Amino acid sequence: MNGAQALINTLVDGGVDVCFANPGTSEMHFVAALDAVPRMRGMLTLFEGVATGAADGYARIAGRPAAVLLHLGPGLGNGLANLHNARRARVPMVVVVGDHATYHKKYDAPLESDIDAVAGTVSGWVRRTEAAADVGADAEAAIAASRSGSQIATLILPADVCWSDGAHAAAGVPAQAAAAPVDVGPVAGVLRSGEPAMMLIGGDATRGPGLTAAARIVQATGARWLCETFPTCLERGAGIPAVERLAYFAEGAAAQLDGVKHLVLAGARSPVSFFAYPGMPSDLVPAGCEVHVLAEPGGAADALAALADEVAPGTVAPVAGASRPQLPTGDLTSVSAADVVGALLPERAIVVDESNTCGVLLPQATAGAPAHDWLTLTGGAIGYGIPAAVGAAVAAPDRPVLCLESDGSAMYTISGLWSQARENLDVTTVIYNNGAYDILRIELQRVGAGSDPGPKALDLLDISRPTMDFVKIAEGMGVPARRVTTCEEFADALRAAFAEPGPHLIDVVVPSLVG
């Protein structure tokens, strides 16, 4: 077989059977090889950022890597923002980047670039395959690397390596070694000391077993707990232990951590502010507080379970009760829009949240909704929501996916709607349309750039001129859509979208929070 066939066979034998792709000329042998390996599902995206974001969303729900196929350095560059988010989410991903034929690179053709350097900014593992005979082993190593430490593994494949014969698929990816047991004794001693303690959880600890263990610990010891501001996947809702998220703004996070003498990290990083602000500290750990690392992201749930058995034997974890807000009436606001979502969110839904300022009240409104998963913008690079919803829907076709998306962020990767329509994915996209970059209006004040901004400054934060017609945009990409301005219209549209399989978009008109 040729190199491309060996690559795809090795991927599917290693459990990587979905490939989100935006190919070019140097990847044509990979494209042709798809018909020879029917077990691989290839999905076309119109922009590389959709492919990388979809692979991120897929991994968060499936718990295993997807492949991404990109074209040369510029294609990799186009996908970089959502690769950054995936790196921060600590998800496994195999990125295949096609390159010029080995003998062609010396001619410095127009698309020639330093792919290795670009890949290194987001990848935990990078390798360039130099011969067809090495493709199988290199692909096997990429899969293993992506799963080890949940990271992005990038394999650079020259065109002549793809088309050359003499390649062989690898026998299979070795099983991942079990994590070494964690010594919970020191942290157990801290929690038993009686001094004010806070657990900050992240990684796999924000799913059922980790949440249950952490809730047992808190119940038994009197410690408090928070989860990361932007968790990779937070299981929440009725019947699941409820954890508050660390506040986004530094002032709020500092208030949550005030008085804490011991901060226990279970799969989370030590907290820092997202940006530097004049006169404010970047490190959010209170003065005099000692930081204790219980576990890294990949083994946090197991470490918490062991700690719970040590300090909370027999303790039952409290869980959130079932409750929903009443359906509101009248004009839509951020408050009432959140209540509509909370009142109608289906059981087992996957919520992809990039609602930004418009969604600040969503956590409260959905706290008692039927159990669901909540995916967030881990790396802060906007344009993640629509692509991640694509990947989540591919990973779990039997579950409804609700993408809560802000208008400005949506436009970064709006072509993901086309992929949703092409694959008939069960995704409902809610666009919060306030015609402004509200978060930047807020930050303009917070960074001290001016309490009375002028018209030129405000114009750069206004996206209402011209008004974006998301109904026409969505319909032009094959997604049924409607615009709503009242709570009643929003509720009707949401019910209809949840009742009918396939993609839908609802353009929700809400006022700006800051005028």
Curated annotation (Swiss-Prot):
EC numbers: 2.2.1.6
Keyword S-adenosyl-L-methionine: no
Alphabetical UniProt keywords: Amino-acid biosynthesis, Branched-chain amino acid biosynthesis, FAD, Flavoprotein, Magnesium, Metal-binding, Thiamine pyrophosphate, Transferase
Induction comment: The expression is high during the mid-exponential phase and low during the stationary phase.
Domain of life: Bacteria
Any GO BP: isoleucine biosynthetic process
Positions bound to Mg(2+): D407, N434
Amino-acid biosynthesis keyword on record: yes
UniProt-annotated binding residues for FAD: 249-269, 283-302
Amino-acid positions noted as binding thiamine diphosphate in the UniProt annotation, renumbered to this chain: E48
Ranges for region Thiamine pyrophosphate binding: 357-436
One CC-aspect GO term: peptidoglycan-based cell wall
Signal sequence coordinates: none
Family annotation (InterPro entries): THDP-binding (IPR029061), Thiamin_PyroP_enz_TPP-bd_dom (IPR012001), TPP_enz (IPR045229), TPP_enzyme_TPP-bd (IPR011766)
Enzyme class of the recorded protein, top EC level: transferase
Biological or metabolic pathway of the protein: Amino-acid biosynthesis; L-isoleucine biosynthesis; L-isoleucine from 2-oxobutanoate: step 1/4; Amino-acid biosynthesis; L-valine biosynthesis; L-valine from pyruvate: step 1/4
MF term (GO), any: acetolactate synthase activity
Reactions that this protein is recorded to catalyse: 2 pyruvate + H(+) = (2S)-2-acetolactate + CO2
Cofactor dependency: Mg(2+); thiamine diphosphate
Extra facts: Was identified as a high-confidence drug target.
Quaternary structure, from the entry: Heterodimer of large catalytic subunit and small regulatory subunit.
Family from the record: Belongs to the TPP enzyme family.
Name of the protein: Putative acetolactate synthase large subunit IlvX
Gene name for this UniProt entry: ilvX
